[in-house]
Curated annotation (Swiss-Prot):
Sequence positions that bind substrate: 168-171
Cofactor (UniProt): FMN; FAD; [4Fe-4S] cluster
Binding site for FMN: 104, 222, 298, 320-321
Protein name stated in the entry: 7-beta-hydroxy-3-oxochol-24-oyl-CoA 4-desaturase
Binding site residues for FAD: 394, 413, 421, 431, 458
UniProt similarity note: In the N-terminal section; belongs to the NADH:flavin oxidoreductase/NADH oxidase family.
An example Gene Ontology molecular-function term: oxidoreductase activity, acting on the aldehyde or oxo group of donors, NAD or NADP as acceptor
Source lineage: Bacteria, Bacillati, Bacillota, Clostridia, Lachnospirales
Length: 661
């Protein structure tokens, strides 16, 4: 496909704004914000870098109209005039980089974290948010005041030189979305009840914003084309409302889908969802309005984006995570350099998930995210002979980074292929997109001249003979089998070996020990692989020949896995009849039985299993580094060889250590 002459990369006029192309950067929470409402340089850099990469517009999320009601702790704001100059500096940087800045103007409403300050969040009705704070139903007078605040924030955005603003009434979320959705709005006055009444807040918000900006200043509106919940707003509701939003002053509709609490996977579609999940709704809405309509939601392939725009289904696309993975996505696409595009696998592992170790937005495959200009693409001061031991995600990232900096890089891999434990992760249904990472890194490695030796078990003697100036140890991890009573007396089967295909489970009763990603995906894979014939030992015939039990010591399954992946998988396991035991400690095992201790201290035997699989995670494997330090000038240990964690840490550490050589 010739992207340079595609409709996707043709200009689009929206009011006074001329976009260079029809790819926008969707709003995403970065958690780089400042306590005073200003835009820190680190946050601004993210958007400036995507502007440099050719994105048509960049949208910063959650710019609040009232700092008393912050969205996520630190929240960017346009609630007072003194913030306009610094916001103008931000907008000017984006413009100089070739794009335009669009702030998403919001009042978080029920989603405000003000409850931690002993201030009740505001909402159309009393609702409990994710922080277990109950919102206070606001009065008519408060509604009018808040509407005026939206207008003033819109004015400030235009004064700051922003190309447009975006308003958010999707996902039954934040204040406007909560008013619009019957799932949240239980009012019985003129702002509740009927669809027209529920839309009143949104329409008045749009009208007030329009009154406070120039007549042709663009106002974008994000909506859920379908809330995809029983009792929620439907596509038919949005087909009715979309022309009303246009008449109120909206210049462009951005069509998302789903609701925040009932189905986050519809808002942030990850590995369990197909691409373009909201394109159908967007295309139907486009038929009833005369303004541009953009689709958003797992549009993670630029060629697919070009296809749906070329077919006239939508006027443009908003891409989020793919632009985190590769800020130069648009430039590379226009130049036809598709192999050069760093692929987003929709994993949600670092951009959506947060942890104590990584509380901000990161990207598995792009270690530069959040530090856009800290690691320039320049050669190393001196070219070194570098050995990387292990070709998993961390080893591959290290090899690529070192070679692209001008080092002479050799990779030794004990297996017959690259990928490491990622080869196990992609076995589970819906996770095959992660194979793109290894394809991409392999392409870059070969282009940079990396030399590979497979089926090569590294020894100190061989390393000494090679005489590298630096070694990066990326030997990964081995399956964890704790010294539980019985493990020495019976053959131990691991989930890792099952996922590797070392044995199959055609039918029978299966107990998987553990409740993390490996264990749950093993259960899922076993169910998918089972033969469909009825198995007649009293098991649920609806799931075929197999009956699966999970035993997890923690209070819930999939701790640490992002919600858009976690919740659908748990629902799937339950729907397939998997017996889930949480708060349950493993005391003893045989090859057919498991003795467990419940939370109340009682113990019992779970019996009659044909297979007992250990899926309790991994432990680091590093047999060489200490010896190598005796004769290699530089030795760096990365990833699971340090401590078993998710692949992102291996790739970040591989990048950083290789860049430092």
């Amino acid at each position: 496909m010739d992207m340079k002459h595609s409709r996707l990369f043709s200009p689009l006029q929206i009011g006074s704004l001329t976009l260079s192309n029809r790819v926008g950067m969707a709003p995403m929470s970065m958690d780089y914000e400042a306590a005073d409402g200003t835009v820190p340089k680190r946050l601004a850099d993210v958007f400036v870098r995507r502007a440099e990469g050719g994105t048509g517009y960049v949208m910063i999320d959650a710019v609040t109209i009232d700092s008393k009601y912050p969205y996520m702790g630190n929240t960017t704001a346009l609630d007072r005039d003194e913030l306009v100059p610094q916001f103008k500096e931000f907008a000017d940087r984006v413009k100089e980089a070739g794009s335009t800045l669009v702030p998403q103007i919001i009042h978080p409403g029920p989603e405000s974290v003000c409850g931690y300050r002993h201030i009740a969040p505001l909402g159309p009705s009393a609702n409990t948010n994710a922080n277990c704070h109950v919102s206070r139903s606001i009065s008519i007078d408060e509604i009018h005041d808040i509407i005026k605040q939206f207008g003033q924030a819109a004015r400030r955005a235009e004064e700051a030189g922003c190309g447009a603003i975006s308003l958010h009434c999707a996902h039954a979320y934040m204040l406007p979305g909560s008013f619009l959705s019957p799932l949240r709005n239980k009012r019985m006055d003129e702002y509740g009840g009927s669809l027209d009444n529920r839309a009143r807040f949104v329409i008045e918000m749009i009208e007030e914003a329009r009154r406070n900006v120039s007549p042709d200043f663009p106002i974008f509106l994000r909506i859920s084309g379908d809330e995809r919940m029983v009792g929620g707003n439907s596509l038919e509701d949005m087909l009715y409302l979309a022309p009303k939003f246009e008449a109120a002053g909206v210049s462009m509709l951005e069509v998302s889908g789903g609701t925040q609490y009932e189905g986050l996977e519809h808002i942030i579609p990850c590995q369990n969802k197909s691409r373009g999940v909201n394109v159908y709704e967007a295309s139907e809405i486009k038929k009833v309005v005369g303004i541009p309509v953009y689709a958003v939601g797992k549009i993670n392939d630029i060629r697919y984006a070009a296809e749906i725009v070329e077919r006239g289904l939508v006027d443009g696309v908003a891409m989020g995570r793919p632009l985190l993975a590769d800020p130069d996505l648009c430039k590379k696409a226009v130049e036809g350099q598709f192999d050069e595009i760093t692929p987003c696998a929709s994993c949600g592992g670092s951009c959506i998930s947060r942890s104590e170790a990584a509380p901000e937005c990161h990207c598995h495959i792009n270690p530069r995210l959040g530090r856009e200009y800290e690691f320039p693409d320049v050669p190393a001061e001196k070219s070194k002979k570098v050995l990387v031991i292990g070709a998993g995600p961390g080893g591959m990232m290290a090899a690529v980074t070192a070679a692209e900096r001008g080092h002479d890089v050799t990779v030794w891999e004990a297996d017959d292929k690259i990928g490491g434990q990622l080869n196990l992760a992609v076995v589970a249904p819906g996770k095959q997109e992660m194979t793109q990472w290894m394809v991409h890194l392999n392409y870059r490695a070969k282009k940079a001249g990396v030399k590979f030796e497979f089926n090569k078990e590294a020894t100190a003697e061989d390393v000494k003979a090679l005489a590298p100036e630096a070694v990066i140890v990326a030997t990964g991890a081995k399956p964890l089998v704790p010294p539980i009573k019985g493990t020495q007396d019976y053959p131990v089967l691991t989930a890792h070996d099952f996922l590797r295909g070392k044995f199959v489970i055609p039918k029978g009763r299966v107990c998987v020990l553990g409740g993390g990603a490996v264990a749950c995906e093993t259960a899922e894979t076993a169910l998918e692989n089972a033969r469909p014939n009825s198995y007649t030992r009293g098991y649920d015939a609806s799931i075929g020949d197999i009956d699966v039990t999970l035993v997890e010591m923690l209070p819930q399954l999939l701790t640490g896995v992002c919600a858009p992946n976690r919740e659908p998988l748990i629902r799937k396991l339950k729907s397939k009849g998997v017996h889930i035991n949480v708060n349950t400690k493993i005391m003893e095992v045989t090859d057919h039985e498991v003795k467990v201790q419940r939370q109340d201290g009682t113990q019992e035997w779970l019996e009659g299993f044909d297979y007992v699989l250990f899926g309790l995670g991994s432990r680091n494997y590093d047999p060489l580094s200490e010896t190598l330090k005796e004769f290699v000038p530089e030795v760096h240990v990365i990833g699971d060889a340090v401590r078993a964690r998710q692949a992102s840490y291996a790739m970040w550490e591989g990048f950083e250590k290789a860049y430092s050589l």
